[in-house]
């Protein structure tokens, strides 16, 4: 449930006039005091009656000045400090129905009033508000008024200028695969969605010699990888199916290949985006590195659409391994598998990917029939991608992996012998989420899924994932774990019905607490969205979040871009 109670106080945008009024009242009070003092020793003086009236006026005026002065100090505390505390803000003010109707005419004009470029159909509004696999769902009234399909960066800019002028909340949308309520329309009644996936979905230019590619924000990452594959290249990140480049940037995605190729933060050269007021900004040119000015890429990556809307980006490409195989290694316990992964990292073994699936996950994959193979060993399993410039290099790495795995009690070591078996073996990892959903719904058609993630330092990975596994097993719910073991990041899949929601919440809460206590993070790659705002506070503290809020207010003072995500922007927001 996501509610706000009431609206109070002055709007921030009224602060300039407020300060003028306060200064005027203070100047008047000073002038009165000066006038009284200069005439106080004059023989005639004021009569007691006049002094009484004047005194009462000054007391009344003083009360007003005090009240305005208190508000002035509140405004001053926001503007003069390096942070923006929630309690120092007033609630954002968005446009009313009448104003929105006027704005809607202008928004449609930008899109040439072509019904192909916008929609108000109920199914489309629903699809842009929630998904069945989201961990946090919109309420029935939380729907946008319209979904807009801009055709290019200039359209996005023009639409945002109108939304900024009329104070209309804007939800950026691309693939719609995020899991923490990132695109919930928390401000219904005057909210619009800007969906870039319909038109801004082109691969613009491959600079093969420089190992980068220029793409629009609505390009699906799988489509980009297929294109790059023909050139012997790949996109380093591999998030969930359906994710698009703008969303990958907004959520700072990573995926199974991050161990070798890095997360989105390491794979973006530059970003073209539209700010809240419609200003078009390109973060930098196309060098592999730069120390010129602020790192705007780093600011925007992971900002979840709260600071700007990404329309185009230059992305790093990586040379594909000449040879690559997949190995599958089961272990008796999650602790054994996790300890093996940490040992491999600390030994400096070069792998393209290293993934951990627990015994429940392996059982679910067998039951789901989602892969061509249905006799997986149903115990915690590590999946490896091993690549190199020659078969000899791969064989040497396999021997090293086998040696370390044997020290952690592995029960089997299977590796691909050809391209088909390689795809078959890795397929189990990529269908994990969907296998869990399908299995849960076969058991209970009304089942919900809670998918969440944390990340911890490598040395803490085994302890944290093992403790989480024990709690999940004891819960009585259908649960499974999947880990990007190479970077200490793991995911929990929890199937529950409405009556079991509290149990699921407790599992997630304890999982996050363990991660933070282990000097980790509440989310390694899913992002904060609505679902983890309180956990972010626990992780980094009030003042650090207040710095983030200050940046938000500086770049989006009307708070129209994806409001209420990552942290609270409204003191009347009482959702936890």
UniProtKB/Swiss-Prot annotation:
Q: Which InterPro entries match?
A: FAD-bd_oxidored_4_C, FAD-bd_PCMH, FAD-bd_PCMH-like_sf, FAD-bd_PCMH_sub2, FAD-linked_Oxase-like_C, Oxid_FAD_bind_N, Vanillyl_alc_oxidase_C-sub2
Could you tell me the EC number(s) of this protein?
1.1.2.4
Coiled coil ranges: none
Cofactor: binding details: Binds 2 FAD. Binds 4 to 6 Zn(2+) ions.
Q: Where in the cell is it found?
A: Mitochondrion matrix
Q: Which GO terms describe its biological process?
A: lactate catabolic process
A single Gene Ontology CC term:
mitochondrial matrix
What is the scientific name of the source organism? Kluyveromyces lactis (strain ATCC 8585 / CBS 2359 / DSM 70799 / NBRC 1267 / NRRL Y-1140 / WM37)
Give GO terms: molecular function aspect only: D-lactate dehydrogenase (cytochrome) activity; D-lactate dehydrogenase activity; FAD binding
Taxonomic path: Eukaryota, Fungi, Dikarya, Ascomycota, Saccharomycotina
Cleavable signal peptide: none
Q: How is this protein named in the record?
A: D-lactate dehydrogenase [cytochrome], mitochondrial
Disulfide bond residue pairs: none
If you read the UniProt record, what top EC class would you report for this enzyme, in one word?
oxidoreductase
What is this protein's function? Catalyzes the stereospecific oxidation of D-lactate to pyruvate.
- Gene designation per UniProt: DLD1
Q: Where is the FAD-binding PCMH-type domain?
A: 139-320
Does the keyword section mention Oxidoreductase?
A: yes
Reaction it catalyzes? (R)-lactate + 2 Fe(III)-[cytochrome c] = 2 Fe(II)-[cytochrome c] + pyruvate + 2 H(+)
User: Which key words are in the record?
Assistant: FAD, Flavoprotein, Mitochondrion, Oxidoreductase, Transit peptide, Zinc
Family to which the UniProt record says this protein belongs:
Belongs to the FAD-binding oxidoreductase/transferase type 4 family.
Cofactor(s) required for function per UniProt: FAD; Zn(2+)
* One Pfam entry name: FAD-oxidase_C
The record's section on PROSITE patterns has:
FAD_PCMH
């Amino acid at each position: 449930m996501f509610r706000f109670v009431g609206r109070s106080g002055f709007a921030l945008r009224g602060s300039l006039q407020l300060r003028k009024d306060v200064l005027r009242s203070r100047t008047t009070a000073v002038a009165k005091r000066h006038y009284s003092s200069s005439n106080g020793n004059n023989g005639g003086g004021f009569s007691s009656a006049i002094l009484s009236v004047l005194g009462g006026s000054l007391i009344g005026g003083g009360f007003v000045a005090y009240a305005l002065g208190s508000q002035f100090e509140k405004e001053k505390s926001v503007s003069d400090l390096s942070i923006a505390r929630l309690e120092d803000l007033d609630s954002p003010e968005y446009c009313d129905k009448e104003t929105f109707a006027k704005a809607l005419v202008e928004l449609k004009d930008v899109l040439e009033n072509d019904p192909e470029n916008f929609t108000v159909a109920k199914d489309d509004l629903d699809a842009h508000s929630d998904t069945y696999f989201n961990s946090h769902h919109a309420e029935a009234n939380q729907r946008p008024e319209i979904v807009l399909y801009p055709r290019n960066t200039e359209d996005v800019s023009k639409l945002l200028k109108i939304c900024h002028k009329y104070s209309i909340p804007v939800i950026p949308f691309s693939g719609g695969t995020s899991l923490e309520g990132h695109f919930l329309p928390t401000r219904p009644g005057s909210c619009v969605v800007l969906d870039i996936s319909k038109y801004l979905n082109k691969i613009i230019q491959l600079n093969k010699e420089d190992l980068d590619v220029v793409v629009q924000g609505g390009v699906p990452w799988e489509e980009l990888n297929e294109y790059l594959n023909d050139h012997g290249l790949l996109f380093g990140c591999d998030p969930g199916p359906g994710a698009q480049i703008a969303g990958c940037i907004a959520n700072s995605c990573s995926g199974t290949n991050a161990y070798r190729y890095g997360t989105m933060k390491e794979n973006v050269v530059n970003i073209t985006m539209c700010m809240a007021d419609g200003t078009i900004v390109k973060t930098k040119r196309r060098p592999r590195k730069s120390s010129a000015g602020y790192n705007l890429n780093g600011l925007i990556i992971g900002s979840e659409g709260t600071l700007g809307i990404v329309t185009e980006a230059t992305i790093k490409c990586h040379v594909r391994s000449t040879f690559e195989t997949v190995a599958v290694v089961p272990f008796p316990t999650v602790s054994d598998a996790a300890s093996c992964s940490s040992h491999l990292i600390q030994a400096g073994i070069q792998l393209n990917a290293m993934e951990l699936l627990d015994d429940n996950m392996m059982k679910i994959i067998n039951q789901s029939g989602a892969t061509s193979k249905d006799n997986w060993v149903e115990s915690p399993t590590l999946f490896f991608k091993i690549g190199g410039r020659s078969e000899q290099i791969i064989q040497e790495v396999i021997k090293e992996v086998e040696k370390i795995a044997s020290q952690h009690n592995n029960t089997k070591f299977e590796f691909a012998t050809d391209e088909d078996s390689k795809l078959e073996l890795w397929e189990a990892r990529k269908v994990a989420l969907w296998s869990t959903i399908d299995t849960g719904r076969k058991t209970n058609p009304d089942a919900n899924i809670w998918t969440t993630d944390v990340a911890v330092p490598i040395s803490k990975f085994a302890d944290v994932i093992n403790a989480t596994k024990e709690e999940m097993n004891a819960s009585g719910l259908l649960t499974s774990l999947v880990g990007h073991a190479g970077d200490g990041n793991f995911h929990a899949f929890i199937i529950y019905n409405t009556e079991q929601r509290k149990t699921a919440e407790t599992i997630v809460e304890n999982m996050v607490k363990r991660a933070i206590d282990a000097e980790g993070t509440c989310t390694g790659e899913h992002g904060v969205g609505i679902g983890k705002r309180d956990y972010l506070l626990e992780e980094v503290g009030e003042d650090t979040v207040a710095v983030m809020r200050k940046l938000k207010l500086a770049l989006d003072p009307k708070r129209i871009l994806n409001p209420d995500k990552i942290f609270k922007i409204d003191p009347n927001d009482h959702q936890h």
